[in-house]
Swiss-Prot record:
The gene is uvrC. HAMAP family: UvrC (MF_00203). It comes from Methanospirillum hungatei JF-1 (strain ATCC 27890 / DSM 864 / NBRC 100397 / JF-1). This is UvrABC system protein C. GO terms for biological process: nucleotide-excision repair; SOS response. PANTHER family: UVRABC SYSTEM PROTEIN C (PTHR30562:SF1), UVRC/OXIDOREDUCTASE (PTHR30562).
Length: 520
């Protein structure tokens, strides 16, 4: 099984995405505690053969932290609808696409509908991929607005009526206009118009209070409190027809760590992460570069204003107005804070792994930039090499490189390693480009010796290690025995993760070349 580092996964609510070697999302899940839930997949005993197969395909895990379980639940629903992962519920199954329906009766009932064709008999809300989400929201609406659920109205009071959770129109306790007002309120909530609903309810509460109908005013007050509580937990999904991008960042040392949330029609659907050197106008530079190849959204939510003219520039690119917003409070500020929280989880748990790796290798400072080499061939033919770069513990794919090996003989991994290391660092020397802080080679002492000899030939005092596949043992130059680093420690797992990525990249390149040669 490929090594997956679980030490960086936070113990917070959120969603996790399992990805295969191509980056395709295999499975999306939610959790109250991400670390516990994700770790459970990698225990020795699994529940089903299907999970065994899923786990064997996992090469990467991405997480998005949320503020609550409800947010995680809604985000999971959005991600499953968008990506339709192979190992999630089959979205063609009508049961997984359940709706909430309010019927067209004079005294409408609320319930579950499993088919869009029933739309003629009422108003549909959804669909909901998660039954838990649907049931939770349905339960809230029933308890808050006391709509009936019975299929046929009788003249006898039901159990819900006795419990005070049904308005009981069947017994004449409520008039049709009064009941329709409750239906309208439920409709507002299910359409995401909770702020409009709260505004109307507050006016109604004030009217009752002014008329000294305090019991009715208290009922409305409790209803407002319940809706506000639900709304505070639903920042991840907001009823909007436009799209938004949320950008937040932090600067550490001379490096900018930036995260971008994609919000499509009110639903958080994905995130992107970036690392780059700090400059005086780094935010402006990022926006200009990113949106030169990506259509700007209707609204860009930021922690600070970019330079003047940026709004007009983005509007010009989009072809319609783009709004730049710097929120100080409210749901947009909450999303900005959520982006920052994910930023810390993504980058600074990685910093902790790097610090531990630096200590384990007795380096003066933690290695910010790590480059790793892997050799791949098919029965000694078509030898290729890959080099992957990790910056601050995260893949830096812009600096990945692929090589066809020219000088090494068939199955001569040592000569192939020497060739690729020499080509890489001779070029960096010619270009006067920065060198990595640490070099990792896939293999044992033999591959390490070949690579280290090239570094000495080039007079490059770069720390270098190797990692052997079977036992996950780490070697350093001049020593035939592996370092005493625990195989499941964050430092060792980070090296394994980097090595696995280099191996994946090399295999992908080799397959591509083989397919090309077959076509020719």
């Amino acid at each position: 099984m490929v090594s997956i580092d679980l030490t960086t996964i936070p113990e917070e609510p959120g969603c996790y995405q399992f990805k295969d070697e191509t980056g395709t999302i295999l499975y999306v899940g939610k959790a109250k505690n991400l670390k516990k839930r994700v770790s459970s997949y990698f225990q020795k005993k699994s529940i089903t053969p299907r999970i065994d197969i899923l786990v064997s395909l996992i090469r990467d895990i991405d997480v998005i932290v949320t503020s609550s379980e409800v947010e995680a639940l809604i985000l999971e629903n959005n991600l499953i609808k968008k990506y339709q992962p192979k190992y999630n519920i089959d979205l063609k199954d009508a049961k997984s696409y359940a709706f909430i329906q309010i019927s067209n009766d004079p005294f409408p009932r609320i319930g579950i509908a499993r088919d869009r064709t029933v739309k003629k008999t009422g108003t549909l809300y959804g669909p909901f991929v998660s039954a838990a989400e649907r049931d939770q929201i349905l339960k809230f609406v029933k308890q808050t607005f006391h709509l009936r659920t019975c299929k046929k109205m009788t003249k006898r009071a039901c159990l819900r009526s006795h419990l005070g959770t049904c308005a009981a129109p069947c017994t004449g306790k409520i008039s049709e206009p009064e009941y329709q007002y409750l239906v309208k309120s439920a409709d507002y909530l299910l359409k995401g118009k909770s702020q409009d609903l709260i505004y109307d309810l507050r006016k109604e509460m004030e009217t009752f209070a002014a008329a000294e109908e305090y019991e009715k005013a208290l009922v409305i007050r409790d209803r407002i409190a319940a809706i506000e509580n639900l709304s505070e937990r639903q920042y991840v999904q907001r009823q909007k027809k436009s799209d938004e991008h949320i950008i937040n960042y932090l600067v550490s040392g001379d490096t900018v760590y930036l995260i971008l949330f994609h919000v499509e029609r009110g639903s958080l659907t994905s995130k992107e992460e970036f690392v780059f050197p700090e400059t005086e106008d780094f935010l402006d530079e990022f926006i200009l570069q990113y949106y030169s190849s990506t259509k700007p959204p209707n609204e860009l939510i930021l922690p600070s204003l970019p330079g003047s003219g940026m709004e007009e520039y983005l509007t010009h690119i989009r072809g319609s107005h783009v709004t730049l917003t710097i929120p100080k409070q409210g749901e947009k500020k909450h999303l900005l804070d959520l982006a920052y929280k994910n930023l810390e989880v993504s980058f600074f748990t990685g910093k902790m792994r790097l610090a531990e790796l630096g200590e384990a290798l007795h380096m003066d400072t933690a290695p910010e930039v790590i480059e790793c080499f892997d050799i791949s061939h098919l029965r000694g033919t078509g030898t290729v090499a890959s080099m992957v770069s990790f910056r601050d513990g995260k893949p830096d794919k812009r600096n990945y490189r692929r090589y066809k090996i020219n000088s090494a003989g068939p199955s001569d991994d040592y000569a192939a390693m020497a060739e690729v290391v020499k080509r890489r660092y001779s070029r960096l020397l010619r270009e006067k480009s920065p060198m990595p802080d640490l070099i990792v080679v896939d293999g044992g002492p033999g591959q390490l010796k070949s690579a280290h000899a090239i570094l000495e030939e080039l007079s490059l005092p770069i720390p270098i290690i190797s990692i052997a596949k079977r036992e996950e043992e780490i070697y350093i130059p001049g020593r035939n025995t592996p370092l005493s680093i625990q195989k499941k420690s964050p430092a060792s797992l980070l090296i394994q993760e980097i090595r696995d990525e280099a191996h994946r990249f090399a295999i992908t390149y080799q397959k591509k070349l083989r397919q090309k040669s077959i076509k020719e």
